[in-house]
Swiss-Prot record:
Family to which this protein belongs: Belongs to the peptidase S41B family.
Organism this protein belongs to: Thermoplasma volcanium (strain ATCC 51530 / DSM 4299 / JCM 9571 / NBRC 15438 / GSS1)
Start and end residues of each stretch annotated as Binds the substrate's C-terminus: 93-94
Keywords for this protein: Cytoplasm, Hydrolase, Protease, Serine protease
Protein name: Tricorn protease
A GO term, aspect molecular function: serine-type peptidase activity
Region PDZ-like, residue ranges: 721-816
Site (Transition state stabilizer): 927
Region (C-2) residue spans: 817-1022
Organism lineage: Archaea, Methanobacteriati, Thermoplasmatota, Thermoplasmata, Thermoplasmatales
Record-listed substrate binding positions: 877-879, 954-956
Annotated localization: Cytoplasm
E.C. numbers: 3.4.21.-
Gene: tri
Region feature (Six-bladed beta propeller): 1-270
Disulfide bonds: none
């Protein structure tokens, strides 16, 4: 079977290509294939250089391929060399440190974002000794020199996950010289990628005709010609030796002759295979777990289920015929699994002693929650059709209990006698209401009747029955008590959750009342009509509770301590909570266990099974919670067949796209064709990166934003990461001379170079000559010397400008991007203040997430007080908080508090008085698009810059592939009054277009910021500011 071949280059009769994460060379004349690399990581984007005697290529490494560096091979000697030591990061769209091209003298030009405050690659000339000399030509991923001119490809990267892209960051080509300036010569309606030059024409890939094909223009960007007519697959990875063009398409390598447009497929044949069976540790891929009514446990990891005992010396693999997502014991002898395939999720019922399937029920949609009744007769599931379904396990009948219009029903409980099902039902007060609220409903299986337990005016969740079905407990976010914002004039509702209890029978009162037995009312039958009138809270403090579990003498409450959102938002780590017990008798709360991510309790309430952030499982008995025991699930080995895994993951990726794309009719129309087109290539996949090639192609067929593949498990290979010291260097006369020591606000934490905190007394112009006793310079670059030094102190020796030598310890960082960002912002702010004599404020918003909100408020409280304001959203990475920021900017000043002592205080506080200008660019996207559009629509001021990214179909990824990969699907299409859906795949046009050409970067001039200052000062001249007399 042929392999999936990618990333070709050509030199004469030799072809480079990547296959199975390795680099290979193929001879056109002899057909010989030769492997050039072995187990470096994931190799791609190789290029011949130095007259075909060497190859430079990129290696991606780390479990999720979150870093990359460049390597080379000498084809004569076989010497392998690591060229860069910067471990440039990747982002969701996988823009890495890469080979951009070659200078006239044959030097490698590197594109990387490693030294930038944003994930936008810039160009550097790589020296033989590892030095990196910035070209200062702005964002670019391709670089070509021809006839004394430089051709720069901005954003001309491969874009398989968004075909027919037309937004602001579509690929463009600039041409010119630093001395005479640059001109944008190719700017089509659609994206262009992989530009190369052969003789007097520029060739590239674009899909302006609806399918990816090779086009060309002359060297001035005119005379557009189409050369191929492909329809099934897109060509990718265009390269040339100046005569013949080579590319990959549909997993094969092709040559293209520019003289006659002849396309030839190369019959390279099978290249490589690998062991089809791979072994994995369950804790790395833990998805779900449960306990049996006896002494057995189950876990789901990497799509497979296992049953095991507490010592994990006995385990049974459950023999499912699909991808397992959840496991629930029905009894000591039976277990149920949620099993998925391309048609949806089904319930499989298995013998718990043998792991053999007994029957299968479904498909039932895509299931997001499942619970079993205590007697094992019923299962309740919630699916993506917003249904809650009741399943009779014995006969497989399925009954719809309820269906919401507004959201998933995934929060439910079954009474121990299997009569009642309580569930949290999503509802909105009207079709145009902003919030989805939830209230508790009760379904009586005996009488086939529904009851409202709570009203629809709050957010009620986590229903739970006591063992005797006398009470129904739930949590509610209705105890409003605002907390003061310590930074701005604001309040937030943080601790508003309390547990409530509802007696289900006449004569019952809250067990927390502890009424004397001689005055307790007579107990009666179920009284379900008046449930919503008799809820009462338990006497515990409000907190951020997530679940409640009734016990005989109290309840367990699981809460997450109030914390800042910043770290968890960006790290993706699950939150850690605390289990406490509230005892009815003494009304005291006792802490049971900390550091809990998720937990399950045994049916008799005596034992708890829980997980921590390390992915491992633990148990403890309620009477001795301090004596926890680790369940060594890694004693179980998961053995997977690679081909079967990839087929399953492909099916799931395709299914998620089909079932979640916002336009259901469109998805159903195109999905089957997409499936067949790429499914036949799955059998050619050998490595996870091969499969990624196909997944991104599937995503791209929907031709919509926010189709990403994130995370996952691509390789076990990692390399030491680069350390950072938040300094820039100029390589001069064999020495690394400090050209900048970076800092933002020097009084803030994490905003300054560690050089400023050392005893070195380093300054600009000093040279670093040693790190940890190793000379730095011609023999070793400073970047290589800092590899593996992150979060460590190193001994640095510098030569001062007066030739004196000093040594001192410097605390090396793992990442200095935030310091670079804050330095960039403070530099811009200082420039604005100086140019306007302090009259105009400056705010930059890096994204519309937690960091963006932080940065906005950090600056807003001081900058909004000036006579005008520049709001900079260039490079804004999107998020969800734009409306919170717009709310502040929209607030106009109405007056002042005029005190006897002190100065005036504006009303409303921090309101804007004066004109505003917003700057945007092609790297402002998603909620950055929405902000840019809204700034114009609300007439807050003039929007200047360049057209934005153009991606406003939102995502809410809820499922992972078996290796932890998160796939996003465009689910929520954004519609604007007056413009409809037009911002998607186009972007927002500024009122005034201001380009940022390459030569402006070279002279360190920001034409967009310059123009913003000019315009806001002109607007200020027309603005009348009124003040009271003091």
């Amino acid at each position: 079977m042929a392999n999936l071949l990618q990333n070709p280059d050509i030199y004469g009769d030799r072809i480079l290509f990547t296959c199975c994460d390795e680099l290979w060379e193929y001879s056109l004349s002899t057909g010989e294939k030769k492997r050039l690399t072995s187990h470096l990581g994931v190799v791609n984007n190789a290029r011949y250089y130095d007259n075909g005697t060497k190859v430079v290529f990129r290696v991606m490494f780390g479990q999720s391929l979150d870093a990359a560096d460049l390597f080379s091979i000498d084809l004569k000697s076989g010497e392998l060399k690591r060229l860069t030591f910067i471990t440039g990061k990747s982002v969701g769209r996988r823009k890495f440190t890469d080979v951009a091209g070659f200078s006239k003298d044959g030097s490698i030009i590197v594109s990387t974002d490693a030294f930038q405050p944003f994930s936008v690659p810039m160009l550097y000339k790589l020296g033989d000794d590892g030095s990196l000399d910035p070209l200062n030509l702005g964002p670019a991923v391709h670089y070509i020199e021809k006839n004394g001119r430089i051709y720069i490809g901005r954003d001309t990267y491969d874009l398989p996950h968004w075909k027919e892209y037309k937004g602001g960051t579509r690929g463009k080509i600039w041409s010119g010289t630093i001395e005479k300036g640059f001109k944008k010569i190719i700017d089509l309606e659609n994206h262009i990628s992989c530009p190369v030059i052969v003789k007097d024409r520029i060739y590239f890939i674009t899909d302006i005709d609806g399918a990816g094909n090779i086009y060309s223009t002359n060297l001035d960007g005119n005379d557009l010609k189409k050369h191929t007519d492909f329809h099934e697959y897109y060509p990718r990875h265009l390269n040339t030796d100046g005569k013949t063009i080579v590319f990959s398409m549909g997993g094969d390598i092709y040559t293209f002759d520019p003289t006659n447009d002849n396309v030839k497929s190369l019959d390279i044949g099978p290249v490589f295979d690998t062991d089809l069976n791979q072994s994995y540790a369950p804790s790395k891929f833990l998805e779900d777990f449960s306990m049996s009514p006896g002494d057995m446990y189950s876990t789901v990891s990497r799509g497979k289920a296992f049953i095991f005992n507490e010592n994990v010396n006995y385990s049974i693999p459950v023999k499912s015929d699909g991808r397992v997502r959840y496991s629930r014991f029905l009894s000591k002898n039976e277990i149920s699994l949620v099993i998925g395939d391309k048609d949806g999720d089904s319930i499989g019922v298995f013998d718990a002693g043998t792991g053999e399937m007994k029957r299968k029920i479904g498909p039932l949609g895509n299931i997001f929650s499942v619970k079993s009744s205590a007697d094992g007769k019923y299962l309740v599931v919630g699916n993506d059709n917003f249904q809650i379904l009741l399943i009779d396990v014995s006969n497989g009948t399925v009954k719809e209990i309820d269906q919401s219009r507004e959201g998933l029903i995934v929060d439910f409980a079954i009474s121990k006698d299997s009569r009642f099902i309580a569930y949290s039902f999503p509802v909105k007060s009207s079709d145009l209401a902003s919030y989805v609220q939830r209230h508790i409903k009760l379904f009586d299986m005996l009488n086939d009747k529904h009851y409202d337990v709570t009203t629809e005016t709050a957010n009620d969740f986590a229903p739970a029955f006591d063992a005797d079905t006398n009470y129904l407990y739930y949590l509610s976010n209705r105890s409003l008590d605002p907390s003061t914002d310590r930074f701005t004039f604001n309040f937030g509702y943080l601790n508003i959750t309390r547990p409530f209890v509802v007696p289900l029978k006449k004569g019952y009162v809250s067990p927390a009342r502890n009424m004397p037995q001689d005055i307790e009312p007579e107990k009666g039958e179920y009284d379900l009509e008046r449930l919503k009138y008799i809820s009462e809270p338990l006497p515990v403090d409000q907190a951020d509770y997530r679940s409640i579990t009734p016990l005989k003498d109290g309840v367990l409450l699981f809460s997450v301590p109030i914390h800042g959102e910043f770290s968890s938002y960006y790290s993706g780590q699950p939150e850690k909570g605390i289990i406490v017990k509230f005892e009815f008798k003494d009304k005291k709360v006792k802490e049971i266990k900390k550091e809990v991510v998720d937990f399950k309790i045994s049916t008799d309430g005596s034992k708890i099974m829980f997980s921590k952030q390390d992915g491992k499982l633990y148990t403890f008995r309620m009477e001795k919670p301090e004596e926890e025991k680790s369940l060594n699930i890694d004693a179980i080995t998961i053995v997977s067949n690679v081909k079967e895994d990839f087929a399953e993951m492909y099916d799931e990726a395709w299914k998620l796209a089909r079932d979640n794309y916002w336009d259901k009719e469109h998805a159903l129309t195109i999905s089957e064709k997409i499936y067949e087109r790429y499914r036949k290539l799955v059998e050619r996949c050998v490595t996870r990166w091969d499969l990624s090639y196909l997944i991104t192609e599937i995503q791209g067929e929907y031709r919509t934003s926010h189709s990403y593949e994130m995370g996952g498990y691509f390789t076990d290979i990692d390399m030491p990461r680069a350390g950072r010291i938040a300094c820039d260097f100029k390589y001069s006369n064999g020495e690394y001379v400090i050209s900048d020591i970076l800092y933002g606000d020097p009084s803030n934490e994490n905003e300054k170079s560690p050089f400023l905190l050392s005893t070195l007394d380093a300054d600009i112009g000093d040279a670093v000559i040693e790190i940890d006793g190793i000379p730095i310079g011609k023999g070793k670059s400073i970047y290589e010397a800092l590899v593996g030094k992150g979060n460590r102190s190193v001994l640095v020796k510098i030569r001062k400008k007066d030739n004196s030598v000093r040594s001192g310890f410097v605390d090396v960082l793992q990442d200095d991007r935030y310091i670079r960002y804050r330095a960039w912002v403070e530099k811009n702010k200082k420039f604005v203040h100086e140019r306007t004599n302090g009259r105009i404020g400056y705010i930059h918003i890096p994204d519309m997430g937690i960091m963006g909100l932080n940065e906005f408020y950090r600056q807003y409280v001081t900058e909004a007080s000036r006579n005008g304001l520049i709001v900079d959203v260039r490079f804004n990475g999107g998020g969800f908080v734009s409306q919170l920021i717009l709310e502040k900017l929209y607030m106009k000043r109405l007056g002042y508090d005029n005190p006897r002592r002190g100065t005036l205080e504006p009303y409303p506080m921090n309101s804007i008085e004066g004109p505003m200008i917003a700057i945007t660019n092609e790297y402002a996207g998603s909620d950055g698009d929405i902000f840019s559009y809204s700034f114009k629509a609300l007439h807050l001021g003039t929007l200047i810059g360049t057209r934005t990214w153009g991606g406003v179909v939102g995502i809410s990824p809820r499922r992972k592939l078996i290796d932890g990969t998160v796939l996003s699907q465009p689910e929520y299409a954004f519609w604007f009054k007056g413009s409809g859906f037009s911002v998607e795949n186009y972007g927002v046009d500024p009122d005034v277009v201001i380009e940022y050409p390459p030569e402006m970067y070279n002279v360190n001039v920001d034409p967009q910021l310059e123009r913003a200052i000019e315009m806001v000062l002109a607007d200020l001249e027309k603005y009348k500011i009124e003040l009271p007399k003091k």
